């Protein structure tokens, strides 16, 4: 097969704006106008329209007289297949023998001292939202480099040895969930449930796949903590 054919058949990855629109439509209980969507995710209205048209072509959104209504199951499937978190550099790996919630609280305190936004994802955040097992690792998204040693963590060689994975992102949309999902659970900031779900698959393992199934059900039946 030629390189051009491979390129045409490859799955095109979403940019940050498209991923943010998808998360917003999954979270929303009702239709949203194009203007409201553009404003909420921080893109231009023409760009929002372009994204919505693409989603409509893939049966992931329906246009109604009141706005656009997301087909949430289809949006989740597309999110898993097409999104990738945009990182400034490679993720870094850290380890501590402290309980995972204690590690997260220490890292959050460090982030607060450095005025650095932070939000937690799998394993810890899904366990706080829809308990499933004893979490062994968590991903922390930050928007600047943090000296994790100051939170009592030591460098680990890789994912298999880590209790905490730090991802430095320049995508502010990854650092807070779409409304009306709650942005904080048990005193810890969490990423959007869609990203938590994606990260469970990214971390891998049969038990995480089961946890992802439970989280998906909780997303779809709206049983996760909400601000309203």
What annotation goes with each model-predicted range?
Residues 147-228:
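Hydrophobic alpha-helical interaction segments
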Residues 16-30:
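Short amphipathic alpha-helical interface segments
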Residues 30-40:
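Short acidic, hydrophobic short linear motifs in intrinsically disordered regions
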Residues 87-173:
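Short gly/ser-rich loop at a beta-strand->alpha-helix junction or flexible surface loop bordering the NTP-binding
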Residues 9-18, 33, 66-85:
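Short, cationic-aromatic polyanion-contact patches
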Residues 44-46:
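Key DNA-contact positions within bacterial/archaeal DNA-binding proteins
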Residues 56-66:
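A short, conserved structural fragment
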């Amino acid at each position: 097969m030629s390189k051009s054919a491979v390129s045409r058949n490859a799955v095109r990855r979403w940019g940050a704006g498209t991923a943010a629109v998808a998360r917003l439509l999954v979270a929303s209980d009702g239709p949203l106008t194009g203007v409201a969507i553009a404003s909420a995710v921080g893109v231009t209205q023409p760009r929002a329209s372009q994204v919505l048209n693409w989603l409509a072509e893939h049966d992931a959104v329906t246009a109604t007289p009141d706005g656009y209504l997301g087909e949430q199951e289809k949006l989740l499937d597309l999110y898993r297949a097409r999104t990738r978190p945009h990182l400034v550099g490679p993720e870094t790996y850290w380890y501590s023998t402290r309980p995972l919630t204690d590690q997260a609280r220490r890292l959050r305190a460090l982030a607060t001292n450095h005025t650095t936004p932070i939000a937690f994802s799998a394993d810890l955040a899904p366990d706080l939202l829809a308990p499933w097992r004893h979490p062994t690792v968590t991903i922390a998204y930050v928007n600047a480099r943090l000296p994790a040693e100051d939170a009592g963590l030591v460098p680990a060689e890789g994912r298999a040895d880590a209790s905490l994975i730090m991802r430095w992102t320049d995508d502010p949309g990854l650092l807070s969930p779409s409304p009306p999902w709650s942005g904080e659970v048990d005193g810890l900031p969490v990423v959007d449930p869609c990203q938590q779900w994606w990260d469970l698959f990214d971390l891998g393992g049969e038990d995480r796949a089961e946890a992802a199934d439970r989280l998906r059900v909780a997303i779809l039946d709206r049983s996760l903590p909400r601000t309203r």
